[in-house]
Amino acid sequence: MADKLDIKAFLDKDEQKDLLRLLTAGSVDDGKSTLIGRLLFDSKKLYEDQLDALERDSKRLGNAGEHIDYALLLDGLKAEREQGITIDVAYRYFSTNNRKFIIADTPGHEQYTRNMITGGSTANLAIILVDARMGVITQTRRHTFLVSLLGIKHVVLAVNKMDLVDFSEERFNEIVAEYKKFVAPLGIPDVTCIPLSALDGDNVVDKSERTPWYEGLSLLDFLETVHIDSDNNFSDFRFPVQYVLRPNLDFRGFCGKVASGIIRKGDKVMALPSGKVSHVKSIVTFDGELDYAFPPQSVTLTLEDEIDVSRGEMLVHPDNLPVVDRNFEAMLVWMDEEPMDINKSFFIKQTTNVSRTRIDSIKYKVDVNTMEHSSVPFLSLNEIARVVFTTAKELFFDPYRKNKSCGSFILIDPITNNTSAVGMIIDRVEKKDMNIADDFPVLNLPELGIAPEHYEAIEKAVKSLSEQGFEVRIEK
């Protein structure tokens, strides 16, 4: 009985640990997979059968000579092992006494930029590896730019293979100075630099005696203690409605995930786009009612008044509204094998909202290696650009730098259903500055000879179309 209680206590404690999502990025052979493998190995997070398989595979496929090749723990695809590179995003989970971790090992090659964007989309922290012999190279700059684009606020520059430069403090300081000079204009608020050797384990889990001049934490100690709670936006309440729950006539609740901000029982809320106002009656979860909710909790809100709210709409505080607009510009990462057709319309999915959208213009493409801007007529796979959009119906958004959940979106090809691109909203664009015709369809009911008693039925049909992403405006 005591053993069972101990197990339950352990599971309860593990459940209460906070979670750090991190990604690793770096050039080919900088040692990303080796570093994560070493982290798992030295923190005693591998089972005996995994260790046995690792030793066998190291002899057969390894690239570490007489050493165990820790990279094989993460390079799961056959092509990756044969080429000694990472192609897909490899996820690994482990926990320590202080924190739980999900690691995304992302590919370093430019042709797999979309894989890195996918792996880093939910990350709190990025580990960017550089080879101590090579220093800051083009790929280092590219990965850092992508990390800044994703809004990741914590970056660890892991200067790996310090054993190959005799753990030189001078060499480490040269690399740090060059990197910090490059990263300063990108606006990443927290950059930490750590000298290490992934193969030998120096400064990975424990401080190394071979770097007496380094006064900082080991990598694992830093990951356990880095403060990420303040990264969440607790100021701007945004609740995209995912589903309207009505199990019986006495209950009507709005289900969704709190994207940002805090909501309490009794708070005044406004439904967008209708502008109707009510108060929160209850905050319901599977485990019972709450007095308040915060991101990223999934809850059901009930309101004091019967107001019409559907999937894709949003509940907010009336004195703190998002941008409500159809015109905006964003940084777009093209992820489709097919090049962009700028004359084609797409579905845009932003929070739970879906609409038709068109691409009005490409302001410039960013060369991710040199940071130079250039004018282009379209985008190809893995290319990044600043793009202007017009949507068929209004979206409710915040700039991505302020609110990741409400400032990000995907473009969906309406024919293939492929995810064509991901985007990070910069801000609204004033229509007067666009000089672009508004060519979405308009139904002028009086001109069509439709009697007023039929207006309500037509409005319901148009609303149904709107929920599917087809916007038709009505004029009465």
Swiss-Prot record:
Where do the segments described as G5 lie? Answer: 197-199
| KW Transferase (keyword) present | yes
User: Catalytic activity, per the record?
Assistant: sulfate + ATP + H(+) = adenosine 5'-phosphosulfate + diphosphate
Primary enzyme class: transferase
Q: Which GO terms describe its molecular function?
A: ATP binding; GTP binding; GTPase activity; sulfate adenylyltransferase (ATP) activity
Region of interest (G3), residue spans: 105-108
Q: Name one GO biological process term.
A: hydrogen sulfide biosynthetic process
Residues the record lists as binding GTP? 26-33, 105-109, 160-163
Top-rank taxon, per record: Bacteria
Pfam families recorded = GTP-eEF1A_C, GTP_EFTU
Pathway(s) where this gene product acts = Sulfur metabolism; hydrogen sulfide biosynthesis; sulfite from sulfate: step 1/3
What are the boundaries of the region G2? Answer: 84-88
- Keyword list, A-Z: ATP-binding, GTP-binding, Nucleotide-binding, Nucleotidyltransferase, Transferase
The answer to whether UniProt assigns keyword Nucleotide-binding to this entry is: yes
Q: Region (G4): which ranges?
A: 160-163
Q: Which residues form the signal peptide?
A: none
Location of the region described as G1 in the Swiss-Prot/TrEMBL record: 26-33
Q: What are the EC numbers?
A: 2.7.7.4
Which NCBIfam families does the entry link to? CysN, PRK05124.1
Quaternary assembly: Heterodimer composed of CysD, the smaller subunit, and CysN.
Role: With CysD forms the ATP sulfurylase (ATPS) that catalyzes the adenylation of sulfate producing adenosine 5'-phosphosulfate (APS) and diphosphate, the first enzymatic step in sulfur assimilation pathway. APS synthesis involves the formation of a high-energy phosphoric-sulfuric acid anhydride bond driven by GTP hydrolysis by CysN coupled to ATP hydrolysis by CysD.
* HAMAP family on file: Sulf_adenylyltr_sub1
Return the similarity comment: Belongs to the TRAFAC class translation factor GTPase superfamily. Classic translation factor GTPase family. CysN/NodQ subfamily.
This chain's protein is named Sulfate adenylyltransferase subunit 1
Organism of origin is: Bacteroides fragilis (strain ATCC 25285 / DSM 2151 / CCUG 4856 / JCM 11019 / LMG 10263 / NCTC 9343 / Onslow / VPI 2553 / EN-2)
